[in-house]
Amino acid sequence: MTTSRSNALGSDGGRRAAHPILRPNPRIRRLPRACCSALALAFLTVAALADGAGATFPRSDTLLSARLDDANWILPAKTYAGNRYTALTQIDKTNVGALGRAWRTDLADDGEQEASLLVWNGVMYLSTPHDGVLALDAGTGKLIWQAAYNPAYVLLFAVSRGVGLADGKVFIATQDCRVIALDAATGNSLWNVQGCWDTSNSWYSMAAYVYKNQIIVGTGGGDNGNIGLVSAFSTKDGKRLWDWQTIPGPGQPGHETWPGDSWKHGGGAVWSGVAVDQVTDTLFVAPGNPGPDFVATKRMGKNLYTNSLVALDISGARPKIKWYYQLVQNDTHDYDPAMIPVLFDGQVGGRTHPLVAIGDKAGNFVLLDRQSGKVVHRLALSRQVGIDTRPSHDGTEACPNHGGGIEWNGGAYDPNSNSFLVPSTEECASWKITSDDPQYIPGQVYSGGPFPKRQNGTGVLTSIDVDTGKLRWRNALPYPAEGGVLITASGLAFTSDVGGNIYAFDASTGHQYWKDSTGSAVVGPISAYSLNGTQYVAVVVGQAGNQQTPNLPTSEGSRVIAYRLGNAPAVVNDATGQVALAHASNGVGGLSEAPSKSTGSAPYTKQQVTQGSEVYAKECAVCHGANLQGISAPALTGPGFAHSHLNGSQLRVVVTQTMPLTAPGSLKPDEYAAVMAFLLSYDCVQPAGNGQQPFPTTDLPGLQQVELGSATCTVTK
């Protein structure tokens, strides 16, 4: 075997700087939304600390008037109502064509970027997929400080949807079920408390949501057979204030919709976000799909409160259900009501009504009276075929796919036209179950079959007349649309697609005024703010391995991009370089210095590489790509893989313990060794002993010094 080396370059054509590697995590958990484990995301990126931020911070009363403060963006969806609407008008229909990039900041964490960008007094705060937190100058993009938390375990396909702000603190809910407060001026940890009850199957990915001195967060993990949990913690010290479980236990209303003990692993995760009616102290949550995902015979019944919109009275010591509406009963296709609820007062029948909008991944869009829960309008925005047919052993076609329909960023209400704008995705798939009686195993996917592969879907932006429920206009988008909508008082609607495009449409007519190609997938929501008299529109982009859809045109890395009027060259900042570690307190998730950088070598033979390529093609290529470039799972080579900081020993643990995802540990020892040989050769690790020593079936101490992903090699067999 011979190899030729080519250096892996960063997004600007230069080699990216190295990062300290954090201490290996002994527990690695699989995330079920792809068929293979995402090796490139198995370990956190490094923390960093630079100059402090000196902005005066919002208090609870400031947050309560967030809707009136359009210079800042201090809640995940702008206001408690969850409506991404801004009164800023500097950018309008007459000049949006001159919108240009003000600045760009490149990020080290190449995971799926879904964070809401919060802005307060000239400082932008965001989280990265592996629970890093950054503070940037909102006018220039320059890094102020950067901090990261080293968790007890990490998620494969990790994601963080944002932070919360209040009282001089930045709050983040982490993948290992912690709720953490950071000093907003320095990024130092102030307190760190346990969140989820079921740490075997649960995690946090939603943005920390601050309301009345409470941090409200919901758990992910419904596909792993947990019970969804919404909790509130004190902003002062992290004290647990209340909990609400989405699956009713014995003696609770709705428990009769679960036969036997099926409720114990019923799912119902609240992973996307929530909204609050401040006048009535009503929290709106939307628990996701039941478990097991695809086998309804294990849980015959309505399966409350999964796939539902639930209105909770949180004025007392414990939440109480006011009303609920179930979008899909006894779901068998993972059709979560992922959309964050949007509250608004709209015109229906000549009168103003308090409304709430919700959407799900089946493409259902529902408008309800938010006081009574009565349905005002319900319509399907995606093509629906076979959604009531249960998955079978032979495979059952259905549209949309579990990644189609209406995703978590949802839509927004335009008060100027009394319209609701919402993006959706057209995509079909085949569901196939592998067991009629799947068994619950802690820490593993509880679905009854593999998740359908993502297809080459397309997007649609739809305008709905709130008065009549009829469609006003629809615009086709070339790629799935998951980034939500931002509407401005000047009549513009900004949206995006995972092909990397950002658009500005006329909110009333759908006419396209502007488009920019970011070079990387856009999945996170768009924010707007004003600084020194200048209006900005900003978003974080990036998605390692093009994991959401296989037909993305390019992936140029993760970055924050801010736009303003004018076409001057954008300021380019680099937040990927090596910097000092931030302080971590409370003895949880401490940081450690990296071992010395070394490419190293490892024993493997040409025969093992050949065998490994065959096993990889059969078991892994469908997700990670024939050339390890990443499809529905991230790339296993190149700069994104390098930033995962897996050394050879850690890679071996992940491969042998988590692959294949649907049947971990099912390969023979020599097959795992062969796959390791193939991966090592592809990532330029040279064979030891002139290629005569085979890769062993057990670990090697020397593999800890083998760095992966910094270069890509062409393997000649």
Give the role of each language-model region.
Residues 606-613, 625-660:
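Gly/Gly-Pro-rich "capping" loops immediately C-terminal to redox-active cysteine motifs
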Residues 105-116, 146-165, 192-207, 224, ...:
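Extracytoplasmic beta-rich repeat domains
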Residues 70-71, 121-122, 167-168, 212-213, ...:
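Short coil/turn segments that connect the beta-strands within blades of beta-propeller domains
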Residues 577, 589-602, 606, 613, ...:
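Flexible coil segments in periplasmic/lumen-exposed cytochrome c-class electron-transfer proteins
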Residues 527-579:
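Blade-level signature of beta-propeller repeat domains, shared across WD40, Kelch, NHL, RCC1
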Residues 228-239, 302-316, 459-465, 556-566:
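Beta-propeller blade signature
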Residues 137-140, 183-186, 235-237, 314-317, ...:
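Short loop/turn segments that connect beta-strands within beta-propeller blades
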Residues 56-101, 246, 250-251, 450-451:
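Blade/loop signatures of beta-propeller domains
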